[in-house]
Amino acid sequence: MRRDVRILLLGEAQVGKTSLILSLVGEEFPEEVPARAEEITIPADVTPEKVPTHIVDYSEAEQTEEELQEEIHKANVVCVVYDVSEETTIEKIRTKWIPLVNGRTATGPRLPIILVGNKSDLRPGSTMEAVLPIMSQFPEIETCVECSAKHLRNISELFYYAQKAVLHPTAPLYDPEAKQLRPACAQALTRIFRLSDQDRDHGLSDEELNAFQKSCFGHPLAPQALEDVKRVVCKNVSGGVQNDRLTLEGFLFLNTLFIQRGRHETTWTILRRFGYSDSLELTPDYLYPALHVPPGCSTELNHRGYQFVQRMFEKHDQDHDGVLSPTELQNLFSVFSGAPWGPELLHTVPTQAGCLPLHGYLCQWTLMTYLDVQQCLAHLGYLGYPTLCEQDSQAQAITVTREKKLDQEKGQTQRSVLMCKVLGARGVGKSAFLQAFLGNSLGEARDPPEKFPLHTINTVRVNGQEKYLILCEVNADSLLDTSLDTTCDVACLMFDSSDPKTFVHCATIYKRYYMDGQTPCLFIASKADLPEGVAPPGLSPAEFCRRHRLPAPASFSCLGPAMPSTDVFTQLATMATFPHLVHTELHPTSFWLRGVLVAVGTAVAAVLSFSLYRVLVKSR
């Protein structure tokens, strides 16, 4: 909604434009009237809509044509004033003033116009019969107000209607010639209806209507008011109420009725509560609320966010089979501007026979929140999170984690979403590794590996806690890029156990990107089902890891009758959760060994101290 309103008064000389302004401000009819009033600013706290309002007068005798066009360009609404006792001033509305205001606007939005019949004290009766044909000819005319500056009649109402024409315009909502909602308005209201229909039975129950009413207007409807609404709809729309529930047709009819009766602010209140702008598009402020993410921090859905997206899953799982079919997923996206998740979803999260189970669905939301929180905020906005959850914005569904360096200092992370970069030469099996994390086999896939997504996500358990682990495949060619972002919670360096050259490549990556840092690293020997290749001169993988105090290389193979072991994924998640255990301390035996060494060291020190004591005693 606009932050201020600029009203311009136009009309023939002596129709009372200046008198209207001065009567409004002074609350009395002025005895002496200047040729033109200075611009008046009415503070927000004294206007009905709580918006600052600027009122601008015009004098044909004092201002040029260029100055007039400049004022028209700056105005938000124009009041064309005529003298009810002078028919020639009414005719000038059609022939002069409206062409001046909107004559140069062949297409696009036109300035709203309020017709103002002044000096109603000089003529009995009304001029509405003479004005109605003009209103029918020019749809930009919002309304007509008859008033008297001398008797202070309808002065406040005139400026209220002018404000209303700007803040709650009719033109984007309603086509007066067709006497129906404009397509963009009907589409926006249809989306709002679908969001409010929580049980997806194609009707709003009394409970859903009251929730909608409370969300938009701050209070529920009285039981009698609910019945009155449904009675009006039943009387006017066939099928507007079915099974005592308001249907989409009934909902659209009610909003049409509001507009036809001059209560279009009611429809605008609904639209703006659900994030729409004056152009009937979701505003950037609604879709992308402010969310500060400092460097080194990540973003996750919090409990409110997970509860909401799970609620959306259950709402659209119409057959209650625990998965979203392609049709059910399409229904979920019907309130979006377009389907955000494509066929790559099948190779990104765990799926079930081409359908999306709740587990995979939550994984996808988690991945999106981590990789692109702005997109996540927009998706939550499309689903109506702020309205349906009665929150200020969807930013309240997001948690920003503490900085990674603090995790490293404390030796443990509180993050529930962990990032693992998978690096290695081309052809070592990175794509197969990512798909194995989902329980998929590349052998069964129709697409070549290069067409697979670069991210997969699943859950693993670390010390009894569930963690989301994201595997991110780093393209082999991008490793030559000095600006490559290798930041992660754990690095997986993959080499082909049958091709020693690929290990040399991994060792180079480790030395370049990770050797001097604190990121845990795990070397993985892929294709463990193949014979081991002849190692070139130099350190073997096991010796290299031992020298650099890294865990021993883990073996991995996608071939065989059984699914690949998930132990390696658990190991990666554990290393990411406890980043201070960068070296071999991750193995249970090393904890025991370290304890033994400490105990032995203590015993040796005690023996040496006792022996030294005996020598000193004897020397005395």
Curated annotation (Swiss-Prot):
GO cellular component, one term: mitochondrial inner membrane
Reactions mediated catalytically: GTP + H2O = GDP + phosphate + H(+); ATP + H2O = ADP + phosphate + H(+); UTP + H2O = UDP + phosphate + H(+)
Entry-linked SMART domains: EFh, RAB, RAS, RHO
Ranges of the Mitochondrial intermembrane topological domain: 618-620
Signal peptide: none
Entry binding sites for Ca(2+) 1: D197, D199, D201, E208
Topology, Cytoplasmic side: 1-594
Crosslink site: Glycyl lysine isopeptide (Lys-Gly) (interchain with G-Cter in ubiquitin): K96, K119, K164
Gene Ontology MF annotations: calcium ion binding; GTP binding; GTPase activity
Binding site residues for Mg(2+) 2: S431, E473
Every EF-hand domain range: 184-219, 304-339
UniProt KW keywords: Calcium, GTP-binding, Hydrolase, Isopeptide bond, Magnesium, Membrane, Metal-binding, Mitochondrion, Mitochondrion outer membrane, Nucleotide-binding, Repeat, Transmembrane, Transmembrane helix, Ubl conjugation
Stretches that traverse the bilayer: 595-617
Description of its domains: The Miro 2 domain is necessary for efficient ubiquitination by PRKN.
Role played: Atypical mitochondrial nucleoside-triphosphatase (NTPase) involved in mitochondrial trafficking. Probably involved in control of anterograde transport of mitochondria and their subcellular distribution. Can hydrolyze GTP, ATP and UTP.
Subunit structure comment from the entry: Homodimer. Interacts with the kinesin-binding proteins TRAK1/OIP106 and TRAK2/GRIF1, forming a link between mitochondria and the trafficking apparatus of the microtubules. Interacts with ARMCX3. Found in a complex with KIF5B, OGT, RHOT1 and TRAK1.
Protein family according to the UniProt entry: Belongs to the mitochondrial Rho GTPase family.
Protein name: Mitochondrial Rho GTPase 2
